[in-house]
């Protein structure tokens, strides 16, 4: 829900239904895998269908499982009758796969393949990773807090606030910089001592 809501908003629609009425389909491109975990992509598509998100399609760069391959997704969107397509990465970070495999100008990019099919009036790309969505960030924070509590042997239902999390990250970064600076200083001192001894 968070993922689709963000894509819909970024495309300028009030909701998924308004996009559907305008003939717009959203295609989320994940990585894919040959591992048995690939079933999660099929399950995600089934979940979208169950939610009534008829204009949401799940694909993968690796094309595994098969129904998530670019050609299969193009066919599914075409058969569903949508004329506008919005491509968006289903990845935490919008890196090489998003910029090149999805939105690149090469003929094998998803954007190029959708355009080359001749079935769509427009193909737009949203270059934004899941990690940019506040609600997804909170899921990571919650899971991290739960893992820390489990490792610490404590059970807690209280989750750090966004402010506390930001403070902790800032402190950790400062400590890391201080450690790195100290380490560099020690290395310089050791080199100076070595020169002095020689």
Predicted region positions:
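Small/flexible residues
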Residues: 33, 196-197
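Extended amphipathic ligand-handling, pore-lining, and cofactor/metal-binding catalytic surfaces
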Residues: 1-155
């Amino acid at each position: 829900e968070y993922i689709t809501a963000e894509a819909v908003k970024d495309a300028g629609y009030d909701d998924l239904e308004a996009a559907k009425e305008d003939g717009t389909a959203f295609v989320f491109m994940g990585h894919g895998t040959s591992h048995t975990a690939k079933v999660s992509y099929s399950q995600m598509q089934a979940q979208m269908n169950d939610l009534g998100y008829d204009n949401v399609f799940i694909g993968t760069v690796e094309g595994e499982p098969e129904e998530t391959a670019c050609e299969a997704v193009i066919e599914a969107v075409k058969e569903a009758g949508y004329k506008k397509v919005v491509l968006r990465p289903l990845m935490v970070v919008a890196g090489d796969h998003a910029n090149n495999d999805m939105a690149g100008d090469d003929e094998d990019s998803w954007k190029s393949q959708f355009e080359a099919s001749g079935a769509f009036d427009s193909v737009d790309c949203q270059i934004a990773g899941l990690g940019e969505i506040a609600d997804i960030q909170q899921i990571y924070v919650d899971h991290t807090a739960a893992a820390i509590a489990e490792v610490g042997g404590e059970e807690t239902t209280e989750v750090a606030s966004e402010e506390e999390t930001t403070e902790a990250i800032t402190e950790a970064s400062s400590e890391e910089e201080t450690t790195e600076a100290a380490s560099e200083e020690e290395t310089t001192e050791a080199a100076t001592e070595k020169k002095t001894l020689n």
